[in-house]
UniProtKB/Swiss-Prot annotation:
Cofactor: Mg(2+); Mn(2+)
Keyword annotations of the record: ATP-binding, Magnesium, Manganese, Metal-binding, Nucleotide-binding, Nucleotidyltransferase, Transferase
Location of the active site: 253
HAMAP family, per the entry: YdiU_SelO
UniProt-recorded Gene Ontology molecular function terms: AMPylase activity; ATP binding; magnesium ion binding
NCBIfam families hit by this protein: PRK00029.1
Protein name as catalogued: Protein nucleotidyltransferase YdiU
Catalytic activity as recorded in UniProt: L-seryl-[protein] + ATP = 3-O-(5'-adenylyl)-L-seryl-[protein] + diphosphate; L-threonyl-[protein] + ATP = 3-O-(5'-adenylyl)-L-threonyl-[protein] + diphosphate; L-tyrosyl-[protein] + ATP = O-(5'-adenylyl)-L-tyrosyl-[protein] + diphosphate; L-histidyl-[protein] + UTP = N(tele)-(5'-uridylyl)-L-histidyl-[protein] + diphosphate
């Protein structure tokens, strides 16, 4: 155990107040020669750490699982999940929660080591992770944070000095993940499947205290909990859709109760606008396609509601009715969030009857002409209509006149409208081919400069800076079709 705490560790372990069926205490498995390859300075500071101390050998040993900081209580969390519609009892198969860091402002964040070795939930896996997927999670999660989308974050990546065997031999790595918590829809499914109402109540009470303390005194706090999670997910999924983010594996174990995006395995950002876009190699039926994400979120939340039925009301029929009523509200909340976001993307302050039609017409044209999602809105924001099939079409020219006329009707000036668009239309996203370039350089050549440059650009997606323009360039035909694999 590390005694020197100049690094700023301030760990608590409230999760162990839950019944022991929710976790297994287990130490991380040491690795041979850990090396720090990436540290998130700004995140470290916000968590109360001293970044310079975290670069020292004793702290790198903690990120590698070779040592534990003061106050650590390593454990693997148990949960269940519907994976592509099929229910399984799961758990942290290659991750350990080492504790909850209490920040200088009193906030609580899980500190989890991902790739830290086998656990009782590993299901024949080796408990390890490869460098490429861990760096990928770092890049995408930090890009999501900069886009103002609730997300888990990445504090550090260390290489282990040991190979990891997948289809081929790959360099091993461990990611330090930071989250408001790792409580998932699947955690509630796990509690419900075990059949103990006391355990289910314990989990619900703990979750309310940790994430939604304002509803503790609510006359039916478990209904209120369901309402809060639905509200958070309706907002989150709308934010995904508005930037063209495709999660790829929206299983119930990847839906957080806090409303943060988690698990960046087969995710990617859409290039051409297409409702049917799928990147994940294992999603052969398009279950988690871009256009399906709102529906799948509702499906996942229905599984949460099912799990809560034993504590929603003492009468089962009444509990079922409460669950159904609350789930039915998701689609309206999602639509409202999405519509408000789309209005901002088009600079619309006021509300007009034609707004829905204006938005739908644009999206239909974008799909028809295979227009790039991000760059179309970027061009509209800059009012630079480029030489593309969409912009040269008669339909678009007609639409553009209607849109300009709509902007002129507003009390707010066009300058204000374009300024709002700038704040809601990212100039750059983590383009799939640029992420792969960065990973190739880092993993194959040990050159992290490409990744650092990409991260620097992605940190300010709404800056519209000229030095970001290289990241707006579309992939060449050889970079398509892009496929992702569940490596994280």
């Amino acid at each position: 155990m590390t005694k020197n705490n100049e690094a700023g560790w301030n760990l608590d372990h409230s999760y162990t107040t839950l019944p022991q069926s929710f976790y297994t205490e287990i130490p991380p498995t040491p690795v041979s020669s850990p090396e720090l390859v990436k540290l998130n300075h700004s995140l470290a500071i916000s968590l109360g750490f001293n970044p310079e101390e975290l670069k020292k050998e004793a702290e790198i040993a903690i990120f590698a699982g070779n040592a534990l900081p003061e106050g650590a209580h390593p454990l693997a969390q148990a949960y269940a999940g519907h994976q592509f519609g099929h229910f399984n009892m799961l758990g942290d198969g290659r991750a350990l929660l080492i504790g909850e860091q209490i920040t200088p402002s009193g906030k609580r964040f899980d500190i989890q080591l991902k790739g830290s070795g086998p656990t009782p939930y590993s299901r024949r896996g080796d408990g390890r992770a490869a460098l490429g997927p861990m760096l990928r999670e770092y890049i995408i999660s930090e890009a999501m944070y900069a886009l103002d989308i609730p997300t888990t974050r990445s504090l550090a990546v260390v290489t282990t000095g040991e190979p990891t065997y997948r289809e081929t031999k790959l360099p091993g790595a461990i990611l330090t993940r930071v989250a408001s918590s790792h409580i998932r829809v699947g955690t509630f499914q796990y509690a419900a499947a075990r059949g103990s109402i006391e355990d289910l109540q314990s989990l619900a009470d703990y979750t309310i205290k940790r994430h939604y303390p304002e509803i503790e005194a609510h006359e039916n706090r478990y209904t209120a909990l369901l309402q809060e999670v639905i509200k958070k997910q309706a907002s989150l999924i709308a934010k995904w859709q508005l930037v063209g983010f495709i999660h790829g594996v929206m299983n119930t174990d990847n839906i957080t109760i806090s409303g943060e995006t988690i698990d960046y395995g087969p995710c990617a950002f859409m290039d051409n606008y297409d409702q049917g876009t799928v990147f994940s190699s294992i999603d052969t039926q398009g279950r988690y396609a871009y256009g399906n994400q709102p529906y799948m979120a509702a499906w996942d939340l229905a599984r949460l509601a099912e799990s809560l039925i034993p504590i929603l009301h003492e009468d089962e029929e009444e509990a079922l009715k409460i669950a159904q009523d609350e789930i039915s509200k998701f689609s309206v909340q999602y639509e409202n969030n999405w519509f408000l976001g789309m209005k901002k993307k088009l600079g619309l302050f006021s509300k007009e009857e034609q707004d829905h039609s204006l938005i739908e017409q644009l999206l239909k044209m974008m799909e028809k002409y295979k227009a790039d999602y991000t760059n179309t809105f970027r061009s509209l924001t800059l009012n630079t209509i480029e030489n593309t099939a969409l912009f040269e079409s008669p339909e678009f020219k007609e639409w553009y006149k209607l849109w300009q006329s709509r902007l002129e009707k507003q009390e707010e000036s066009k300058e204000n409208a374009y300024e709002m668009m700038k704040n809601n239309n990212p100039s750059i996203i983590p383009r799939n081919h640029r992420v792969e370039e960065a990973l190739e350089a880092a993993v194959t050549n040990g050159d992290y400069s490409v990744m650092e440059k990409l991260l620097e650009a992605l940190a300010n997606p709404y800056a519209y800076s000229t030095d970001q323009e290289e990241y707006c360039v579309l992939p060449t035909p050889t970079n398509r079709p892009y496929r992702t694999f569940c490596g994280t």
